[in-house]
Amino acid sequence: MSYYQGNDSRKITGGQKGKNRDKRKYELGSPPTETKISDKDIKEKDRVAGGNFKLRLRYASYANVYDPQSKTAKKVKIISVLESPANREYARRGIIVKGTLIQTELGKAKVTSRPGQDGIINALLLRE
């Protein structure tokens, strides 16, 4: 089943609207990429509008964590998902999105990239 993002074919009253053209390819979408924690990184290459490509990160094991105190970035292992501002269920299911708080080997970090769009997890180390 496709993800159609065009106008609805129903009127406010519930009746069918008249169809004046077919669905177009640019009106199609895709399901959300729900990045989860795993042993290894698994990426998918997805063709998008304009012939461009998006790297969708399906499973992640490492994050690039930036430490603002020492001004250095390190590749560290992700231990768990603590909380997610997008959805409470995401934290329980272990899904990583932008703004998610993750537990890493260095400590707590906040995800600053969009894993489902960028194909990588960048995070900012938080100091308590």
Swiss-Prot record:
Signal peptide: none annotated. CDD domains: Ribosomal_S8e. It comes from the Archaea. Gene3D superfamilies: 2.40.10.310. One of its GO terms (biological process) is translation. Keywords: Ribonucleoprotein, Ribosomal protein. Residues 1-41 are annotated as: Disordered. The keyword Ribosomal protein applies. GO terms for cellular component: ribonucleoprotein complex; ribosome. Belongs to the eukaryotic ribosomal protein eS8 family. This is Small ribosomal subunit protein eS8. It comes from Sulfolobus acidocaldarius (strain ATCC 33909 / DSM 639 / JCM 8929 / NBRC 15157 / NCIMB 11770). The gene is rps8e.
